[in-house]
């Protein structure tokens, strides 16, 4: 110590022990919209804007473009924290696509959907539920999936321009990323600007519903089979039967396309994402992996540059184990564990200031295929006479 001799009492504070781990926030929507007549102060172009009341914000979103309709669609489902980037509507679809995809200017300013990457620095939140309602053509969808990977978020995409089941299935072949879900067709709903029923973007409703499920149930529950608010119909005919797999809905789901059904209201039907890896076939498998990665990483900033003693490694391991037990008890995981692998933590590695901690987990699978086995039997007639006399 700085002074070895001291005639008196000194207290040295020792901060050891496990730290509690807080799960990262997941119910944060991020979307890119058009709306040339929106309030320019409320929604400046190419700048991420934090909205805590989507319904009130929709009043300043104008009437043109997709901004007001998307905010209204989200507010029908929930009132999540939302990050919006407004871009100018181009004179052509190609120009609008360029505006939405965005770029980085010579001054380093990010435009279009790339501005979502600045949200955490500028606004203090990271959008994780991503969409571009009404403008998510193949070029936009491809870029949005890249954004989803960068943000560890999840993108909800429409089968843009598809008119039939077969077209939607063919369109799905354009993607392989686990960070996205493809939806076909759209909903229908009442448009207060047109004073008529019109197409209601399914992706906008998916953003709001995903946030609602995260808040009320959890990120381990998929989007499928939850009632959707604020819609009056479906934009295309989709044949669905709960007990028959040979349907339009069954064929779409089999090919990783989430569809829409009407049963006790309107619902998304399908839990699969666009992953080419069977380990992450379901939407909630991907989101579970993302949540755990960010939760575990961000919860251990405190440990960086601490003296690498055995007690530090033990505290990290016990903290992760405690978090796993908590997630299991709440139903977010089936199981999970954490340990130190001696084979990768040899003396040379440790001497270099490197520590490797392993953990595993089992996500909660959605019940996609329920088989009920029905049997006919006469065994309940054996005691017929005795039951009569009784």
Regions from the language model: what does each represent?
Residues 1-390:
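Surface-exposed assembly/interface segments
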